[in-house]
Amino acid sequence: VYKRQPWYGLDALADPRNILLGLAVLFLSRVLGLLYFMNNIDEQSIFDRSRRHLRWNAAAFVATFVAFLVTLLLARGWAVDPASGRISEEPYKYLHNLLAMPVVFVLLVAGILSVLWGIAEGLFRRGRRGIWFAGAGTVLTVLCLLLTAGYNDTAYYPSLTDPQSSLTIYNSSSSRFTLYVMSIVSLLIPFVVAYIWYVWRSMNRVRISEKELGKEDHPY
């Protein structure tokens, strides 16, 4: 997409939305880490420190994510004509996508509210289960943002120098054989998810504590 420019894609840093998204991901990672500590470490001093750091990290995340989401919904996008394949600019394209896909819109709102609920669980209720709400909400929100960027005849990776070279679901898909193989392999995903769930549940069955770490045969 940036092959004609000498910056090799680094000029994407000039787009404030990219900076806002990067900061939102950074602070969200810190928020999820703090919520994980609060849930899985049985030490009151660490719980209190995590809760204290959660305040400003959560505030920074909410501020940067809201700014990113607002600028995204108000930004122009690139629409694909399904008949001719021609790509043209469309104002408020991503907002139009959400309105055209009500299920995605509802799931996006649910994901955002779930993340906020997880943060509130740790901040105001002093609960330890905030990571479950925030983690599930993060997965749901990211999925909906990806669907908003690529579905509804949208160029998900637009070219700023040659719009007709933008990447879409139509022109970036693999061959029929590759898609067939990938669809077969994707049947393994539930087993992989179940394995990950089992391993993490086994690891987190007992909270980490000073006494637990003092054992020679601890499970870590």
Feature-to-residue mapping (PLM):
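Juxtamembrane membrane-water interface segments of multi-pass membrane proteins
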Residues: 34-53, 71-90, 113-135, 152, ...
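Loop-centered beta-sheet repeat module
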Residues: 10-64
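Hydrophobic alpha-helical transmembrane segments
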Residues: 9-28, 95-113, 172-192
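Short, small-residue-biased leader/transition segments that mark boundaries at the very start
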Residues: 1-2
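Hydrophobic alpha-helical membrane-insertion segments
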Residues: 57-71, 133-150
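Short, membrane-exposed interhelical loops at transmembrane-helix boundaries
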Residues: 87-91, 157-178
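Juxtamembrane non-transmembrane "cap" segments at the membrane-aqueous interface
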Residues: 142-164
